[in-house]
């Protein structure tokens, strides 16, 4: 059964002082793959002088552009629809996924995570990567609490694990850190789920030639209500907005997301 979802994404940067010659890279656009088909997508960027669309090294859709004129805010609005079919799995060749076996600065396992890993049941008890990752996810969920405001975008897995508190990015980074200790290929996913709020983060586990999705924040396998925006080794690879400009002073960012079932 295919589920159709409608999505709205809004991001706005507000600058304390005017900026100019703003060169940006945006990564906030769902792409069509085996599992999801995106259509009726509309994109509005303000201000913009020039833009082009390309794929990054992980296959994520990116828009590169320039806003030359002076401005005190910068915004992007994306809306569209997506058909999700969880029976169609995202396949990948094994030789392509090796990069996702290894830690990154944000998913590096320190003393606490390694100690936690030693206390887990032996991996031999689980028949495949997915079942093993599912067990690890359960153990994280029992030992971690969802709390906003105690971590930030630069918080790594070890720091969040020591706090035993954090948000979806932290849950995902901790699961990736533990799976990579066992050389299970796994990656970070940024996307959207039903309701109103911000973007969400979860993981993909490589198992027998396909990527299967786990949401450690909600302790479950992802269903047909998840819209994928991007994936990579960690949250840094899925950064929504990157840019350089002249001027600006302090800046604040607003993100609003709405996903509904049609």
Give each language-model segment a name:
Residues 1-84:
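Intrinsically disordered, low-complexity N-terminal segments that are enriched in acidic
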Residues 2, 26-43, 219-238, 248, ...:
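Glycine-rich, small/acidic residue-mixed loop/short-helix segments
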Residues 47-52, 98-103, 221-228:
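Short, surface-exposed linear segments at secondary-structure transitions and domain or protein termini
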Residues 61, 84-86, 220-224:
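A short local loop/turn or secondary-structure capping micro-motif enriched for an aromatic residue
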Residues 71-77, 206-221, 247-262:
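Short flexible/disordered coil segments
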Residues 89-91:
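Domain-scale recognition of soluble eukaryotic interaction modules
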